[in-house]
């Protein structure tokens, strides 16, 4: 893996960790920064509201000049997502990709796609047909799937105020856990470094990378 590619991915991960407002989480799988998972909540006012949607992310060797490969791990009833495989039809993940895009911007685009499906360019033709011909049935089924398949993962709440760990933002703890560190170690280091909020983390030298250095030593 090239140093430039590695640095780019590491920077994107750090940016996601520090951006609390985006409501996006990204973490590595088995410490492999070419294979990640992303997660976001279903948008309010849609059949996906209240759901937590996990996306598998594979980073190509020539990233960011080629788009990441993204598939929904969470089953979702949507015209632009295969109900069988989770494959996604979204232009910026194909021919409209640009190196200025990031994993975060791609995940935000996926979240926006849940607000504005494009049934004229479907990934799942059967779902698109229901969307166009019987919209109320589409909404009912999408809500049922959200309820059945998109429950919050254990221990994850993107909005929660933490009281258990001395007021430390739970998103910080959850994000650091994805790097394989124990909760006990994370809390101990964050308390020692006086990190409770995303703002504290932003002001910390080197941000999330600075905390990762502390956890490794």
From Swiss-Prot:
* Annotated pathway: Protein modification; protein ubiquitination
Q: Which UniProt keywords apply?
A: ATP-binding, Cytoplasm, Nucleotide-binding, Nucleus, Transferase, Ubl conjugation pathway
Mention any one GO cellular component term assigned to this protein in its UniProt record: cytosol
Query: In this protein, which residues make up the domain named UBC core?
Result: 4-151
Localization, UniProt: Cytoplasm; Nucleus
**Top-rank lineage group of the source organism:** Eukaryota
Any Pfam family hit = UBA_3
- Name the Gene Ontology biological process terms: ERAD pathway; protein polyubiquitination
| Residues of the active site | 89
Question: Where is this chain primarily localised?
Answer: cytoplasm
* Top enzyme class: transferase
**Which PROSITE patterns does this UniProt record tie to the protein?**
UBC_1 (PS00183), UBC_2 (PS50127)
Translocase recorded as keyword: no
- EC id: 2.3.2.23
GO terms of molecular function: ATP binding; ubiquitin conjugating enzyme activity
Q: Which reaction does it catalyse?
A: S-ubiquitinyl-[E1 ubiquitin-activating enzyme]-L-cysteine + [E2 ubiquitin-conjugating enzyme]-L-cysteine = [E1 ubiquitin-activating enzyme]-L-cysteine + S-ubiquitinyl-[E2 ubiquitin-conjugating enzyme]-L-cysteine
The UniProt similarity line reads:
Belongs to the ubiquitin-conjugating enzyme family.
Q: What does this protein do?
A: Catalyzes the covalent attachment of ubiquitin to other proteins. Functions in degradation of misfolded or regulated proteins localized in the endoplasmic reticulum (ER) lumen or membrane via the ubiquitin-proteasome system. Cognate E2 conjugating enzyme for the HRD1 ubiquitin ligase complex, which is part of the ERAD-L and ERAD-M pathways responsible for the rapid degradation of soluble lumenal and membrane proteins with misfolded lumenal domains (ERAD-L), or ER-membrane proteins with misfolded transmembrane domains (ERAD-M).
User: What's the protein here called?
Assistant: Ubiquitin-conjugating enzyme E2 1
């Amino acid at each position: 893996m090239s140093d430039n590619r590695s640095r780019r991915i590491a920077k994107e991960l750090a940016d996601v960790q520090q951006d609390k407002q985006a409501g996006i989480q990204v973490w590595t799988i088995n410490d492999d920064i070419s294979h990640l998972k992303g997660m976001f909540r279903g948008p309010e006012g849609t059949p996906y509201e209240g759901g937590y949607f996990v996306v598998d992310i594979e980073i190509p060797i020539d990233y960011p000049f080629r788009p990441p490969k993204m598939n929904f791990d969470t089953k979702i009833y949507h015209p632009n997502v295969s109900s069988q495989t989770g494959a996604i039809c979204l232009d910026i993940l194909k021919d409209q990709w640009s190196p200025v895009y990031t994993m975060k911007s791609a995940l935000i685009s996926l979240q926006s796609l849940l607000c504005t499906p494009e049934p004229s360019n479907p990934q799942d033709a059967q779902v698109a047909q229901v969307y166009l011909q019987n919209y109320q049935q589409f909404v009912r089924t999408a809500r049922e799937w959200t309820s059945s398949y998109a429950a919050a993962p254990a221990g994850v709440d993107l909005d929660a105020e933490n009281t258990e760990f001395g007021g430390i933002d739970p998103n910080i703890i959850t994000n650091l856990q994805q790097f394989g560190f124990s909760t006990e170690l994370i809390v101990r280091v964050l308390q020692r470094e006086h990190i409770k909020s995303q703002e504290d983390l932003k002001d910390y030298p080197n941000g999330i990378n600075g905390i990762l250095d502390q956890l490794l030593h």
